[in-house]
UniProtKB/Swiss-Prot annotation:
Catalyzes the attachment of serine to tRNA(Ser). Is also able to aminoacylate tRNA(Sec) with serine, to form the misacylated tRNA L-seryl-tRNA(Sec), which will be further converted into selenocysteinyl-tRNA(Sec). Its EC number is 6.1.1.11. The lineage of its organism: Bacteria, Pseudomonadati, Pseudomonadota, Gammaproteobacteria, Alteromonadales. It comes from Psychromonas ingrahamii (strain DSM 17664 / CCUG 51855 / 37). Keywords: Aminoacyl-tRNA synthetase, ATP-binding, Cytoplasm, Ligase, Nucleotide-binding, Protein biosynthesis. Pathway: Aminoacyl-tRNA biosynthesis; selenocysteinyl-tRNA(Sec) biosynthesis; L-seryl-tRNA(Sec) from L-serine and tRNA(Sec): step 1/1. Belongs to the class-II aminoacyl-tRNA synthetase family. Type-1 seryl-tRNA synthetase subfamily. GO terms for molecular function: ATP binding; serine-tRNA ligase activity. Homodimer. The tRNA molecule binds across the dimer. The keyword Cytoplasm applies. This is Serine--tRNA ligase.
Length: 428
């Protein structure tokens, strides 16, 4: 949620910054609502003061033995007017809050201007894509030939965009997740967490999935007037970030770094017809997520660090990748700046996203009331949150299968994973 001060004191500049990411701010409506808010606030405060004054007069008149019936009647009328004004104020505040919840975060000045992904800016490339002296196969053909990827059974059990893995491919998938967790906890300073896969609506509002992305969620019951019930997590960002909800940390506690390996569940409502083959876009997929809670002055430094942690996984797996900074029109709803890491997939002859690392600033913290108390200060301040994939496990499996394939269809196991595979060096 945006700082209300931006909407009250600098609405024109805020509108321009939001326009750079394709969002049209209704300045006229907001100005009208703000004017109503000011009037209602003054009315409420005036009526409250009058009621307090009349209450004193009643007490004084009673002491003098006077008839206080007229004063009590007047107080009753004031009370009714005050209750009505408070109700109007609450309804208006809810309307303003609803609008605020629909607004994306303000892009940072270092994010390049642009309309869509075609205007993202490449920062670097790492590693050289391998040149094969045979016709490369994609991960679907490789996995099915090794009896490790079973899409037919998944369709029978659940439908499209699901997968059944078996044998050594399933073990390789598990090994990737274990390796990522070990790297982040043993070398990058993260605390491993086990979190719920079902979350409530408050958690989803807190991290920004609601109200905008409700259609992308799997819910345990249909939406009702009372709410949507519980939802399967679209990413571990939701439960991990909600660890900070209504918390006040000491400054010395920061930064806090959390990581978790979870399945993620997405309806992919807006992805009809895209990536229908293979593991690239699934309703259920595994991901190792990284989340940080940091001092506001250090969040952009933390973004570079967190992105580097995701990059290290790719480097250690010897997977060629490129790093891009997203333009304003392609950033996620809550991000103020985002880096994407894209891994090389030989069968597609292109780089594909495997990690997205974002500085959210105080956007989530304001919704969550996630705060810290600066050393020597009495008043707590909002902290900054960051998140990133470290990495998407299924897409990493795709990259390993395709980049480490041999001419006979077998798969060489990356050296750093062999200890997780019982010393196995090849599959097939």
């Amino acid at each position: 949620m945006l700082d209300p001060k931006f909407l009250r004191n600098d609405i024109e500049q805020t509108a321009l910054r939001l326009a750079s990411r394709g969002y049209t701010l209704d300045v006229e409506l907001l100005n009208q609502l703000e004017e109503k808010r000011k009037i209602l606030q003054i009315t409420t405060e005036t009526l409250q003061a009058e009621r307090n004054s009349r209450s004193k007069e009643v007490g004084q008149a009673a002491k003098r033995g006077e008839d206080i019936t007229p004063l009590r009647t007047e107080m009753g009328l004031l009370g009714e007017r005050l209750d009505s004004a408070k109700e109007d104020f609450a309804l208006l505040a809810e309307q303003i809050k609803s609008l605020a919840y629909s607004m994306p975060n303000l892009p940072h000045e270092s994010a390049p201007l642009g309309k869509d992904e075609s205007e993202n800016v490449e920062i670097l490339k790492w590693g050289e894509p391998k040149k094969f002296d045979f016709e490369v196969k994609d991960h679907v053909d490789l996995g099915e030939a090794l009896d490790g990827l079973d899409f037919k059974s998944a369709v029978k059990i659940s439908g499209s965009r699901f997968i059944v893995m078996r044998g050594k491919i399933a073990k390789l998938h598990r090994a990737l997740a274990q390796y990522m967790l070990d790297l982040h906890t043993d070398h990058h300073g993260y605390t491993e967490m086990y979190v719920p896969y079902l979350v409530n609506a408050d958690s989803l509002y807190g991290t920004g999935q609601l109200p905008k992305f409700g259609d992308d969620l799997f819910n345990t019951k249909p939406a009702t007037e009372e709410g949507i019930g519980m939802s399967l997590i679209p990413t571990a960002e939701v439960p991990l970030t909600n660890m900070s909800r209504d918390m006040i940390y000491d400054e010395s506690d920061l930064p806090l770094k959390l990581t978790a390996h979870t399945p993620c569940f997405r309806s992919e409502a807006g992805s009809y017809g895209r990536d229908t083959r293979g593991l690239i876009r699934q309703h259920q997929f595994d991901k190792v997520e990284m989340v940080q809670f940091v001092h506001p002055e250090k969040s952009f430094e933390a973004l570079e660090e967190l992105t580097g942690h995701a990059e290290q996984v790719l480097k250690n797996l010897q997977l060629p990748y490129r790093k891009v900074v997203l333009c304003t029109g392609d950033m996620g709803f809550g991000a103020t700046k985002t880096y994407d890491l894209e891994v090389w997939l030989p069968a597609q002859d292109q780089y594909r996203e495997i990690s997205s690392c974002s500085n959210i600033g105080d956007f989530q913290a304001r919704r969550l009331q996630a705060r810290f108390r600066p050393t020597g200060a009495k008043k707590p301040e909002l902290l900054h949150t960051l998140n990133g994939s470290g990495l998407a496990v299924g897409r990493t499996l795709v990259a390993v299968l395709e980049n480490y394939q041999l001419e006979d269809g077998s798969i060489e196991i990356p050296q750093v994973l062999q200890q997780y595979m019982g010393g196995l060096t090849h599959i097939g």
